[in-house]
């Protein structure tokens, strides 16, 4: 076993040859490399599969022996400073490695077909493999310096992949927004790392935790400074995991290809923030204010993400806000000290959300046969509906993922979310009420997405091809009426557009974003020359990963069932995490009896079913297929209470549709303020600084020209003036000093 761990350092570097060879091939042999481009997809899947097998083998050994392995190479620079590099294999590392590789393999297989018609096929697989390398390097790092290096590489890869179709200005601005927002958190992370090195003198996790705990125990640290450094460390996780208030980049990250959305939201970028907090939890737990801050940020994000998902029309943006809310649950669990529950939900959510995103990609792919390549139309749930008849396999798997996120047993997220909800009652009743209420909202907005997409009729057939509504035959709206109430508020923004950080101009979607081999409609307007009247199911290479992730969604929750009775240990996850749990909670007991579990589960499942019922009432075709739901409303007497209720609903709708006005607030005050400051400094530089230097030159030029014209160019005149000046000088000298 020791020999196996010795070779674990190679894990991050196994996928690295793919981007290196693709880059070299495109430079040296571009034609041959492009001709055999699908070979690189096979190589990417093969190398990542090797990492997966190695990670599973290490995980089995850890479950059986509860071991942790760390190896460090020390580079001694001088007697006072040495730089250490190494790798750490513990339960957290093995869990993250399996998540990254399993989800990554499914995404790569899926992408082979999804990106088959794209000219950037090779570039896409190069980025994906480098993304896997960066994330694997991050989770195997044994110190904060390595964490930061791979942390920045993960951010770089996400920037490249979100802006993969960089010719579309919307995508270019989205990747810039993600990059700039994450720079805020990364700067805090760097300052926090330097602060804790100044306190402890070490970057290594094991030494850092031991030294810091001793300093806290002996009361030898400045608690204000320690708290500040911990907040700065946490800021990096807030930005990476899209927690409030640095969450604004996440929905705009949907401008990248859909497989990237699946990878970012399941196993890579957003998981990095949760991983960092979990890795540093032994540090944070001895600082009570930080643990409370983590839980507060988590519960705010839980509720905010759920409310923002309520009125989204873009299917990927709706799932993005769902990810934000679920990450809030994980952060809440970590803030409460529920280490096991947080990692359990990280595992179950990763597979469920990857399933949903790949399913949405299959839906978008099928919608493009009708509306052409236009994300504003192919991702618009208002143009979908009735797809259950056309994409039945996608429908079944998407329903599995939806039910899992809703918390319906026996699917994966039911087991993990229920643990977090139960732990929240012990931590804070207020937090518990918010968390349980948000569970109902989750069921509502997830079934809203499902019903708008798969039930009813294909809504695109009930629209004019100029994009305007016909007389509504099939009308669905969030609040049971046709149309959207427009808000004239100063901060209202168009939800179909990104918030532009670095550009004043807002551009339409570029028509040349992706080259397709089959014909498609123009993007500016619908045309009557449709390729196909109805969507069709995706190819097998796209359905296979969806099917596998569906199996994970069905069965992965079984690893964390917390029932240990009569010598039967069903809780594999607790045994797997035993070294970490014993470090954090030496006397913890994760077992639970059936009666207690069923009592808690009945409440959570009832709340989930209530949310599903409300969504079904508003969006099920039996209620929404009338010509206009206002027909029903006309029979209801609109008294003062009803008018007030409508105002409340419209306010919630505007809040959700306009992203809680947070993006608009940042754009107006932060971006506008920075741009105003830049314009002022530009004016000051041009008019004042340059004016002073240029003014001296102009004055010198004018004086010189004046003297030149006075002299006239004659030597006799120069001699006359010279003698006159000397005479005047001598006369003045005589008058002043003669006495």
Swiss-Prot record:
Biological source species: Solanum tuberosum
Q: What is the lineage of its organism?
A: Eukaryota, Viridiplantae, Streptophyta, Embryophyta, Tracheophyta
Keyword Cell inner membrane recorded: no
Assembly and interactions?
A: NDH is composed of at least 16 different subunits, 5 of which are encoded in the nucleus.
Per the record, the GO terms for biological process are: ATP synthesis coupled electron transport; electron transport coupled proton transport
What is an example of a GO molecular function annotated in this UniProt entry? quinone binding
Q: What is its EC number?
A: 7.1.1.-
NCBIfam families per the UniProt record, alphabetical:
NDH_I_L, PRK06590.1
The protein's name is: NAD(P)H-quinone oxidoreductase subunit 5, chloroplastic
Q: Which locations, inside or outside the cell, does it occupy?
A: Plastid, Chloroplast thylakoid membrane
Where would you find the membrane-spanning parts of this chain?
Answer: 9-29, 40-60, 89-109, 125-145, 147-167, 185-205, 219-239, 258-278, 286-306, 327-347, 354-374, 396-416, 425-445, 543-563, 602-622, 717-737
Q: Which InterPro entries match?
A: NADH_UbQ_OxRdtase_chlpt_su5_C (IPR002128), NADHpl_OxRdtase_5_subgr (IPR018393), ND/Mrp_TM (IPR001750), NU5C-like (IPR003945), Proton_antipo_N (IPR001516)
Annotated signal sequence is none
Q: Which gene encodes it?
A: ndhF
Q: Which GO terms describe its cellular component?
A: chloroplast thylakoid membrane
Main localization, broad class = plastid
């Amino acid at each position: 076993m020791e020999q196996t761990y010795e070779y674990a350092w190679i894990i991050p570097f196994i996928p690295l040859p793919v981007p290196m060879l693709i880059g070299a091939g495109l430079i040296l042999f571009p034609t041959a490399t492009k001709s055999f481009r699908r070979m690189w997809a096979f190589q990417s899947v093969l190398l990542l599969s090797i990492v997966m097998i190695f990670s599973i083998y290490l995980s089995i050994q850890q479950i059986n022996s509860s071991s942790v392995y760390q190896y460090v190479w020390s580079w001694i620079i001088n007697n006072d400073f040495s730089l250490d590099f190494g790798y750490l294999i513990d339960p957290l590392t093995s869990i993250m490695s399996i998540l990254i590789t399993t989800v990554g393999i499914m995404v790569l297989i899926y992408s082979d077909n999804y990106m088959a018609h794209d000219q950037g096929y090779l570039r896409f697989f190069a980025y994906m493999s480098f993304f896997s390398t960066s994330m694997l390097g991050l989770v195997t790092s044994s110190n904060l310096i390595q964490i930061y290096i791979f942390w920045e590489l993960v951010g770089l890869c996400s920037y490249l992949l979100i802006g993969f179709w960089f010719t579309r200005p919307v995508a270019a601005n989205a990747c810039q927004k993600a990059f700039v927002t994450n720079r805020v958190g990364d700067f805090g992370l760097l300052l926090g790392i330097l602060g804790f090195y100044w306190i402890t003198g070490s970057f290594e996790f094991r030494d850092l935790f031991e030294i810091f705990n001793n300093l806290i125990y002996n009361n030898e640290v400045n608690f204000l400074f320690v708290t500040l450094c911990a907040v700065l460390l946490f800021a990096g996780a807030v930005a990476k995991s899209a927690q409030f208030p640095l969450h604004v980049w996440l929905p705009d990250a949907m401008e990248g290809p859909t497989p990237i959305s699946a990878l970012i939201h399941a196993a890579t970028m957003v998981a990095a923030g949760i991983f960092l907090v979990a890795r540093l939890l032994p540090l944070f737990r001895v600082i009570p204010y930080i643990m409370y801050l983590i839980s507060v940020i988590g519960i705010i994000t839980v509720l905010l993400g759920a409310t923002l998902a309520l009125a989204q029309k873009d299917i990927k943006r709706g799932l993005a806000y769902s990810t934000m809310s679920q990450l809030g649950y994980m952060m809440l669990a970590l803030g409460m000290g529920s280490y096991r529950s947080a990692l359990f939900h990280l595992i179950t959510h990763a597979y469920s959300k990857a399933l949903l995103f790949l399913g949405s990609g299959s839906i978008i792919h099928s919608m493009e046969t009708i509306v052409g390549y236009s994300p504003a139309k192919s991702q618009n749930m208002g143009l979908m509906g009735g797809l259950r008849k056309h994409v039945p396999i996608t429908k079944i798997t998407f329903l599995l993922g939806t039910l899992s996120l809703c918390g319906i047993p026996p699917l994966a997220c039911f087991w993990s979310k229920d643990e977090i909800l139960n732990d929240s009652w012990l931590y804070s009743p207020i937090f518990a009420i918010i968390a349980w209420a948000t569970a109902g909202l989750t069921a509502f907005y997830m079934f809203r997405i499902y019903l708008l997409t798969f039930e009813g009729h294909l809504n695109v057939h009930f629209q004019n091809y100029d994009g305007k509504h016909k007389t509504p035959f099939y009308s669905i709206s969030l609040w049971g009426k046709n149309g959207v109430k427009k808000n004239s508020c100063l901060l209202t923004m168009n939800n179909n557009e990104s918030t532009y950080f670095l550009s004043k101009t807002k551009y339409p979607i570029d028509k040349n974003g992706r080259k397709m081999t089959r014909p498609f409609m123009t993007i500016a307007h619908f045309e009557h020359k449709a390729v196909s009247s109805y969507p069709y199911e995706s190819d097998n290479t796209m359905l296979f990963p969806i099917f596998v992730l569906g199996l994970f969604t069905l069965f992965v929750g079984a690893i964390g069932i917390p029932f240990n009775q009569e010598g039967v240990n069903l809780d594999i996850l607790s045994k797997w995490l035993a070294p970490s749990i014993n470090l954090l909670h030496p006397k913890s007991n994760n077992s639970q009896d059936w009666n207690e579990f069923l009592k808690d589960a009945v409440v959570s499942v009832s709340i989930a079913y209530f949310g599903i019922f409300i969504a079904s009432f508003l969006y099920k075709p039996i209620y929404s297929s009338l010509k206009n739901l206002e027909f029903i409303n006309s029979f209801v007497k609109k008294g003062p209470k009803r008018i007030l209720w409508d105002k409340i609903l419209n306010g919630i709708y505007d809040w959700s549709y306009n992203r809680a006005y947070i993006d608009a607030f940042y754009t107006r005050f932060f971006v506008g303020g920075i741009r105003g400051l830049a314009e002022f400094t530009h004016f000051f530089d041009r008019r004042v600084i340059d004016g002073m230097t240029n003014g001296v030159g102009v004055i010198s030029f004018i004086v010189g020209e004046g003297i030149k014209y006075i002299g006239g160019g004659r030597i006799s005149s120069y001699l006359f003036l010279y003698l006159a000046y000397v005479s005047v000088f001598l006369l003045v000298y005589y008058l002043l000093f003669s006495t």
